[in-house]
Amino acid sequence: MSLPSELQRPVGFDRLYGLEIDLATPEEMRARVQVTDDHLQPFGLVHGGLFASIAESITSMGSWLGVRDEGKSAQGLSNQTSFLRPLLGGTVHATARRRHRGRTTQVWEVDITDDQDRLCALVRMTIAVRDAP
């Protein structure tokens, strides 16, 4: 599956932390980030903000894929991240699935896992759907 041209190379903040998109559809997104020392908090664990950032980016992208042809844009409205297991290194894997598509909002759930497919965080994202600028 080929990615839409807008998602083939990360830009801005996504490029800064190393986001790589593996699957992009309006219903499901998959991505990963190779952990570096820049992703760690002072105690050697992957910073929770990385998990939240990945979730917000990929759910906004997936939502946008479903509304762009309607002249709409998509951006994070609410990000609720539950941290379940520390991640020390390797790769952060994220799988996002759309749970609700409304006229002005979408709700997504994101599983954040490690290289052993162990669940490290659960994220629930609410995405605002607005007229494109």
Say what each PLM segment does.
Residues M1-P133:
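Terminal targeting signals and extreme-terminal segments of soluble enzymes
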